[in-house]
Curated annotation (Swiss-Prot):
ATP binds at G129, T130, H131, G132, K133, T134, T135. The lineage of its organism: Bacteria, Pseudomonadati, Pseudomonadota, Gammaproteobacteria, Moraxellales. Cell wall formation. This is UDP-N-acetylmuramate--L-alanine ligase. InterPro entries: Mur-like_cat_sf, Mur_ligase_C, Mur_ligase_C_dom_sf, Mur_ligase_cen, Mur_ligase_N, MurCDEF_pg_biosynth, UDP-N-AcMur_Ala_ligase_MurC. It is found in: Cytoplasm. Its main location: cytoplasm. Pathway: Cell wall biogenesis; peptidoglycan biosynthesis. GO terms for molecular function: ATP binding; UDP-N-acetylmuramate-L-alanine ligase activity.
Length: 482
């Protein structure tokens, strides 16, 4: 047996202790991106899993196909015989299942606390940051898999290569996204952590204080053991600011020369990016990632930092990047549709913060320099639209044609001056692009597509709300242009 094979086998076949007295776990809001993955992993560990959601979806259908009982609608009787309830921050305290659990003295835990339990007896790797978590988590998972380390993973989007966002592996490794939106990532105690960047988002959680947000990231990194590892983006000014307070082993990555891991000679080739990675004590390594944009090169560097430290070979890293098929709704090509003498290419992306939208626009420009860029954008949350209003005006003015959906509330009440009509008016006053408001309920989507789209356009559907479903609808109906 080779040393590599022996080492790999030593990292596998870990027996994970079960949670005492817990047999039946019920998830309130099981259809959520963060909830369904944990539910599936626990089901595969042998727990009885049930859950409820406000409406049926592809996710709830998939869960039922995998043997998980899903109730549509929230009722007290749904939690019968459950030993614990798992809830997300989106669940109202007045939810009948939550109230019933309180009355019956059934423990109620937050999603991240249950994720922390999954991580407790494994070698946990948590990926945090305002942007890029899902892609970075997926890249690292793919690298570990290429080294035959078979990790458990819980990701916030569908990994295109497997068609799922979570799976139970046989090794001691677990890779998971760490959610800062409600500060619940403080429940996690990983062995290694990535922080991709720190930006002002979800500020209601932090009482509007950016300093509190940064302090919370410091707390998160302090959850690492003193022998753990933090891999952080050294190009990010806010990360550099907190580094003196981290007090844990740190590796920095980025494009700047003072980083421990950096990318040089970056080239864009359509939907692919080529770069050379420099690491201390190693030969330069030329790599290709099957994704466009400098932000994805940074995501790759983060994953490379942890993978290298965990003993993943350069060959496995190279294979993982070259074969990476992406994550659902992350610059996902929906198809090309004939129009006149050319075609329109439809791409769907989940990014909803101004910096994410800007990175997507840059990737679109770099990968499709000869196409006119038409963006169908749906702002996500009134609070984010309010807090990032000026940034949205600047970023959305960078496209050639802007189509605006109304704000997706995500449970929030409307805020005066933070709606799409006001945003459109401000963008119009800037004078770079003429926004068009779309109301699918009124049925003007079809007419606007027919009047706006031109041969060889790139149509980018952008946002975290139901704009993804609208993108699917557009693809199914040939963009309404045929």
């Amino acid at each position: 047996m080779s040393p590599t094979t022996a080492a790999n086998q030593a990292k596998k076949l870990i027996k994970v202790p079960e949670m005492r007295r817990i047999k039946h776990i019920h998830f309130v809001g099981i259809g959520g991106a963060g909830m369904c993955g944990i539910a599936e992993v626990l089901a595969n560990q042998g727990y009885k899993i049930s859950g409820s959601d406000i409406k049926a979806s592809k996710t709830t259908q998939q869960l039922e196909e995998n043997g998980i009982k899903v109730y549509i609608g929230h009722e007290a009787e749904n939690i019968k015989n459950a030993n614990v309830l798992v809830v997300s921050t989106a669940i109202d305290p007045e939810n009948p299942e939550v109230k019933a659990a309180i009355e019956q003295r059934i423990p109620i835990v937050r999603r991240a606390e249950m994720l922390g339990e999954l991580m407790r007896y494994r070698h946990g790797i948590a990926v945090a940051g305002t942007h890029g978590k899902t892609t970075t988590t997926s890249l690292l998972t793919t690298m570990l898999a290429e080294e035959n380390l078979d990790p458990t993973y819980v990701i916030g989007g569908l990994l295109n290569s497997t068609g799922v966002n979570a799976a139970l592996g046989e090794s001691r490794f677990i890779v998971a996204e760490a959610d800062e939106s409600d500060a619940s990532f403080l429940y996690l105690q990983p062995m290694a952590a990535i922080v991709t960047n720190i930006d002002a988002d979800h500020m209601d959680t932090y009482e509007g204080s950016f300093d509190k947000l940064k302090d919370t990231f410091v707390q998160f990194l302090h959850n690492l053991p003193f022998y753990g590892l933090a891999v952080v983006c050294g190009d990010d000014a806010n990360i550099r600011e907190i580094l003196p307070r981290v007090g844990r082993p740190v590796i920095t990555y980025g494009f700047n020369e003072d980083n421990d891991i950096r990318a040089i000679d970056v080239e864009q080739d359509g939907m692919r990016s080529h770069f050379t990675v420099l690491r201390k004590g190693r030969e330069p390594l030329r790599l290709t990632i099957n994704q466009p944009g400098l932000h994805n090169v940074l995501n790759a560097l983060a994953a490379i930092g942890v993978a290298t430290d965990e003993g993943v070979s350069d060959e496995a890293i190279s294979r993982a990047l070259k074969g990476f098929s992406g994550v659902g709704r992350r610059f996902q090509v929906q198809g090309e549709f004939e129009l006149g003498e050319g075609n329109v290419k439809l791409v769907d992306d989940y990014g909803h913060h101004p910096k994410e939208v800007e990175a997507t626009i840059k990737a679109a420009r770099q990968s499709h320099p000869d196409r006119r860029l038409v963006m169908l954008f749906q702002p996500h949350r009134y609070s984010r639209t309010r807090d990032c209003f000026d940034d949205f005006i600047e970023v959305l003015s960078q496209v050639d044609q802007l189509l605006l959906l109304e704000v997706y509330p995500a449970g929030e009440k409307p805020i005066v001056g933070a709606d799409s009509r006001t945003l459109a008016r401000s963008i119009r006053l800037r004078g770079q692009v003429e926004p068009i408001l779309i109301d699918p309920v009124e049925g003007n989507l079809q007419n606007i597509m027919q009047n706006v789209l031109q041969p060889n356009d790139l149509l980018l559907t952008q946002g975290a709300g139901n704009v993804g479903a609208i993108s699917v609808e557009l693809a199914q109906h040939h963009l309404y242009v045929k």
